[in-house]
Amino acid sequence: MAIERTLSILKPDAVKNNITGNINSYIEQSGLKITAQKMMLLTKKQAELFYEIHKDRPFFGELVEFMTSGSVVVQVLVGENAVSKYRQIMGATDPKQADKGTIRGDFADDISENRVHGSDSLENARKEIAFFFAECELV
């Protein structure tokens, strides 16, 4: 099994609703370790660059507005198959389709405010981690 890094973002709705500790518990109970973490307020430019892959999608403007509406917590998670493991504990993108026992299944109600972001591939995890963290911040 491969030890990997993945990026997690606890979105503004998670911070505003004070459930970051609950989400961190799900992460740690899965066997993943939080090795870097910081709270920040994304600028419009940062959100546009981070979600650039979605720039031609109809929800892009709403996504950028939401991601800049309040503080987020960005994290680096480390563990065996971290990318797929975190995607599994996040649950389906649409909380209505997410299983109970997943972050979205237990804490989210709406697809546009679904509490968390996680890298979808090892390659994207590397890019996303580098977007938010300098190499010297990584353990």
UniProtKB/Swiss-Prot annotation:
The active site is at 117 (pros-phosphohistidine intermediate). Its cofactor is Mg(2+). Signal peptide: none annotated. It catalyses: a 2'-deoxyribonucleoside 5'-diphosphate + ATP = a 2'-deoxyribonucleoside 5'-triphosphate + ADP; a ribonucleoside 5'-diphosphate + ATP = a ribonucleoside 5'-triphosphate + ADP. Its EC number is 2.7.4.6. Homotetramer. PANTHER family: NUCLEOSIDE DIPHOSPHATE KINASE, NUCLEOSIDE DIPHOSPHATE KINASE DDB_G0292928-RELATED. This is Nucleoside diphosphate kinase.
